[in-house]
């Protein structure tokens, strides 16, 4: 028996002798309603052509939201679409040509070697380029990638990341911050270097400012005159923790074709089961995941099956279990499918500030993001949730699906939908399955429904139905 299993055994022994049996009895009827094959079918429906990749603000996302609401209301739950402003863009095409030494030409292959970010303005610009490390201007932290280079009228090229993992860099690692800094210094556009080119909608349009990403292998072609590579520069920045900016011997000709919709709306799908206790029903346990994806672009569908139709399907299965269970918990349970996670978390932020008026307090938050592939589900738990760790471990009995448990003590730029709940001091837990996942999956056309697996979604749904019921039924 390994250390983790030994610890679990001790926890179970420490609980009252009838605890696990009573927990199982309380949720048995609901658990029997959870079916992995139903979750897979939901993923297929949410990632089909009618939802157009579910980019919030687009009609395809609205179709997905209306369908999801119908799934909740068909169970007899109350529900609504919670609207908020969400501009969006659709990318129709683009091109990128780099000229080195005024003679050698490299044409980037769309989607493989470059892809405009989904908040870039449309247009065509030809300009010199400058490498600016992490693209960070933070004089208050004693760090400035722009200090010794002139970027006016040029493209800035940078990596995504920070000198180290200190939380002090979080603001400076946001796309919006980097774009603002570059634009204010007169740059005509920003070019990210990523290991793999992906679709990315998390930013705001700046007029006449173009934004794209290129692969590290394409950037290596631009570095031949310097005798350097992407790996060399990354290693230098990490080791020295000092700027290493310099002009590139490359003129970039970038064209972006996109349509922008500044007045579109997004929706959270909100549904709830009222608690049985006259007083405690004003408190709620929130169970959610983001419904949105990155959309359809350049004539291709980005289905978003694993990310995050899988999480949405699990929330629907858990809602079904609560309804079919018959025994309502003392607190209310609110089921939410958030919009705009991929565009900056606007949906979850809006919900956290706009609870349905009958609820006075959020007692806990459970979030699912990419839970459809693998054999275990890993968790990120806030310190305020740690007191219930024993109940979580006990809920795994007979399932053996619970993987690593990580404590969340600070927020990062990629923390997703847990952010507004963490800031409000709501005890929370986030879940993601352990994969593995193909390289062409994340924010790419390869994220298709045939890859998600019934067993992991069924076990995850049962685990968190048990645990969610416990949280909602606490005295």
Protein language model features and the residues they cover:
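Short helix-loop-beta-strand segments that form the rim/entrance of peptidase-like active sites
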Residues: 319-346
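N-terminal capping segment at the start of a domain
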Residues: 26-28, 33-59, 75, 80, ...
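Extracellular/luminal Protease-associated
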Residues: 108-213, 274, 302, 320, ...
């Amino acid at each position: 028996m390994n250390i983790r299993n030994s610890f679990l055994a001790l926890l179970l022994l420490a609980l009252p002798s009838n605890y696990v049996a009573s927990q199982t009895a309380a949720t048995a009827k609901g658990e029997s309603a959870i079916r992995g094959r139903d979750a897979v079918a939901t993923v297929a429906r949410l990632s089909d052509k009618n939802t157009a990749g579910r980019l919030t603000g687009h009609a395809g996302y609205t179709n997905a939201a209306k369908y999801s609401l119908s799934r909740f209301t068909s169970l007899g739950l109350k529900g609504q679409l919670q609207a908020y402003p969400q501009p969006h863009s659709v990318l129709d095409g683009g091109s990128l040509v780099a000229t080195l030494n005024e003679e050698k030409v490299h044409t980037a292959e769309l989607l493989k070697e470059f892809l405009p970010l989904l908040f870039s303005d449309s247009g065509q610009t030809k300009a010199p380029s400058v490498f600016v490390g992490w693209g960070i201007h933070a004089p208050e932290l004693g760090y400035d990638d722009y200090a010794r280079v002139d970027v006016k009228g040029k493209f800035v090229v940078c990596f995504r990341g920070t000198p180290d993992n200190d939380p002090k860099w979080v603001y400076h690692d946001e796309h919006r911050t980097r774009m603002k800094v570059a634009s204010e210094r007169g740059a005509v556009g920003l070019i990210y270097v990523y290991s793999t080119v992906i679709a990315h909608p998390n930013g705001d349009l700046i007029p006449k400012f173009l934004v794209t990403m290129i692969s590290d292998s394409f950037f290596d072609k631009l570095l031949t005159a310097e005798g350097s590579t992407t790996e060399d520069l990354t290693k230098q920045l990490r080791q020295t923790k000092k700027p290493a900016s310099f002009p590139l011997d490359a003129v970039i000709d970038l064209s972006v074709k996109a349509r922008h919709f500044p007045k579109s709306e997004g929706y959270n799908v909100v549904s709830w089961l009222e608690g049985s206790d006259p007083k405690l029903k004003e408190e709620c346990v929130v169970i959610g995941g983001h419904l949105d994806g990155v959309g359809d672009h350049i004539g291709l569908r980005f289905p978003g099956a694993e990310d995050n139709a899988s999480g949405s399907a699990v929330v629907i299965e858990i809602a079904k279990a609560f309804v079919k269970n018959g025994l309502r918990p003392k607190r209310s349970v609110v089921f939410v499918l958030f919009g705009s996670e991929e565009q900056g978390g606007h949906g979850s932020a809006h919900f956290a500030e706009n609870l349905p008026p009958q609820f006075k307090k959020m007692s806990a938050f459970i979030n699912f993001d990419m839970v459809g592939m693998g054999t275990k589900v890993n968790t990120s738990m806030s310190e305020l949730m740690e007191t219930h760790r024993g109940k979580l471990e006990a809920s795994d009995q007979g399932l053996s699906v619970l993987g690593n448990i990580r404590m969340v003590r600070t927020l990062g730029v990629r923390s997703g939908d847990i952010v507004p709940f963490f800031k409000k001091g709501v005890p929370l837990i986030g879940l993601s399955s352990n994969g593995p996942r193909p390289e062409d999956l994340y924010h790419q056309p390869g994220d298709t429904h045939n890859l998600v697996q019934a067993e992991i979604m069924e076990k995850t749904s049962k685990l968190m139905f048990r645990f969610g019921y416990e949280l909602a039924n606490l005295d």
